[in-house]
A protein has these predicted regions:
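Extended beta-strand/beta-hairpin segments
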Residues: 1-57, 68-151
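Alpha-helical metal-binding/catalytic segments enriched in His/Glu/Asp
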Residues: 62-63
Length: 151
């Protein structure tokens, strides 16, 4: 007898409060506030998170969380994971939009036998990250997988 899998819907709620000029605060229940500003290129303050930073970070963090969920499910032992991300913001058709988010994950494992598994799991994470699946920007992955010596 086949068991039918059911899927839930989820809701995410945030609140933004304007503070001054091009600066505000993002709030969510039971989480620390995040100060935000326009980027300096758009007359905002340097050194403060921007919506652009958060957009690219959302894709990056979702890919991490999806990768780790699949890795744990498949019994892959990950020594470390770090990923640099770049978002390409372009002026097209009279407006700015992110056309691409590039991810450069660096994953370290204990065994050479796990290198291909990591690449397969990264592809699965890439295909199933719900943030990436919700945006029109292309998301590319350029992974580097290393085996740690001496463990």
């Amino acid at each position: 007898m086949e068991t039918k899998k059911t899927f839930k819907s989820f809701s995410c709620e945030t609140n933004v409060v304007w503070k001054s000029a091009r600066r505000g605060v993002v709030r969510a229940a039971a989480k620390p506030d995040i100060e935000v500003s326009s980027p300096p290129e758009f007359k905002g303050e340097a050194g403060i998170w921007t919506p652009e930073d958060m957009f690219v970070s959302a894709v990056n963090a979702c890919t991490l969380m999806t990768f780790m969920a699949v890795a744990m499910q498949r019994g892959l032992e990950v020594v470390s994971y770090e990923c640099r991300a770049e978002g390409l913001l372009e002026y097209l058709g009279g407006k700015y939009r992110f056309t691409e988010v590039r991810l450069y994950p660096q994953v370290v494992v204990k065994s050479q036998a796990d290198v291909e598994r990591v690449k397969n799991i990264l592809e699965s994470a890439h295909a199933n990250c719900f943030i990436s699946n919700s945006i029109s920007s292309a998301v590319t992955l350029t992974p580097e997988v290393r085996v740690v010596a001496g463990i």
